[in-house]
């Protein structure tokens, strides 16, 4: 993968930086693993906006991703790497020895023709999935489960990874990219290696329209609104809002703590760093 800067032939291309990946499949995705993905425009069943800044965008199918990796002991071969419009990471179509095909998140360095496997006896190599109880301390992993059998929930986006710091009986200690150190059950599964397409964070869309293609609408500042629309609205001339930053509903924002799940606080060894 490489970054490509464009010549400034127009205002929209002047700041455009694209991620070029010649290894991705050029054709259509694997149809049996596609599902309809209807757009809501941010509206609920009453037609009211429940999520702002959503609307428009290109039609997409949802790719069914195997986040559980439960086909233990059956070797698989990577058929191809594909683009997925629903996530920042690329995905890989793998063919198992029993004839079944599944999509997985493509780890860094994975390419067509590579062999992967899952299960407690899987070799220690990138792309293989196994319980963290069976992984060496210090391993870099992604697609990490929080509960055994629930499916991966942590480190699924492009370039993400988690490091196994220690193993102590029933739990392993993980260091997340945010700096948080937390404990997870040792029987939870993870995939070795880090997620590929790390250059995704270095791209530049170049123009506002590129965000509209992705279904993202503009964000209007509260201080530019009227008092009826936002707590920061109104005033004569340009103002700073006149109070600490809040959401349109008066909730503190920009740094206010939002974590409410005290039940799982006991698993957090060290809180994340800013």
From Swiss-Prot:
Biased composition (Basic residues): 254-274
Cellular component terms (Gene Ontology): large ribosomal subunit
GO molecular function, one term: transferase activity
Region (Disordered): 28-53, 223-274
Compositionally biased spans, kind Low complexity: 39-48
Protein's UniProt keywords contain Ribosomal protein: yes
Gene3D superfamilies named among the record's database cross-references: 2.30.30.30, Nucleic acid-binding proteins, Ribosomal protein L2, domain 3
Source organism, top-level taxon: Bacteria
Keyword DNA-binding belongs to the record: no
GO biological process: cytoplasmic translation
Alphabetically ordered keywords of this record: Ribonucleoprotein, Ribosomal protein, RNA-binding, rRNA-binding
InterPro entries the record matches: NA-bd_OB-fold, Rib_uL2_dom2, Ribosomal_uL2, Ribosomal_uL2_bac/org-type, Ribosomal_uL2_C, Ribosomal_uL2_CS, Ribosomal_uL2_dom3, Ribosomal_uL2_RNA-bd_dom
A Pfam family annotated for this UniProt entry: Ribosomal_L2_C
NCBIfam families linked to this entry: rplB_bact
Protein purpose: One of the primary rRNA binding proteins. Required for association of the 30S and 50S subunits to form the 70S ribosome, for tRNA binding and peptide bond formation. It has been suggested to have peptidyltransferase activity; this is somewhat controversial. Makes several contacts with the 16S rRNA in the 70S ribosome.
Subunit details: Part of the 50S ribosomal subunit. Forms a bridge to the 30S subunit in the 70S ribosome.
Record-stated family: Belongs to the universal ribosomal protein uL2 family.
Protein name: Large ribosomal subunit protein uL2
Organism: Pseudoalteromonas translucida (strain TAC 125)
């Amino acid at each position: 993968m490489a970054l490509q800067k464009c010549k400034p032939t127009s205002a929209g291309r002047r700041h455009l930086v694209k991620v070029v990946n010649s290894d991705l499949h050029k054709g259509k995705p694997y149809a049996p693993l596609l599902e309809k993905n209807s757009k809501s425009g941010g509206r609920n069943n009453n037609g009211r906006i429940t999520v702002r800044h959503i609307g428009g965008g290109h039609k997409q199918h949802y790719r069914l991703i195997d986040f559980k990796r439960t086909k233990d002991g059956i070797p698989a071969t990577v058929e191809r790497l594909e683009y997925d419009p629903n996530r920042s990471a690329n995905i890989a179509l793998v063919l198992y020895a029993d004839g079944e095909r599944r999509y997985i998140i493509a780890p860094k360095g994975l390419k067509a023709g590579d062999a992967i496997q899952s299960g407690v006896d899987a070799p220690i190599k990138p792309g293989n999935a196994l319980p963290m109880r069976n992984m060496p301390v210090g391993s870099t992993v992604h697609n990490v489960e929080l509960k055994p059998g629930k499916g991966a929930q942590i480190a699924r986006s492009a370039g993400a990874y988690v490091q196994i710091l220690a193993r102590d009986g029933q739990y392993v200690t993980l260091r997340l990219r945010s700096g948080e150190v937390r404990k997870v059950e040792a029987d939870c599964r993870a995939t070795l290696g880090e997620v590929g397409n790390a250059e995704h964070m270095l791209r530049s869309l170049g123009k506002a329209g590129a965000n509209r293609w992705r279904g993202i609408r503009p964000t209007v500042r509260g201080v530019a609104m009227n008092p009826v629309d936002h707590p920061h609205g109104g005033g004569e001339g340009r103002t700073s809002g006149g109070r600490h930053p809040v959401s349109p509903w008066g909730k503190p924002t920009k740094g206010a703590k939002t974590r409410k799940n005290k039940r799982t606080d006991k698993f957090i060894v060290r809180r994340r760093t800013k």
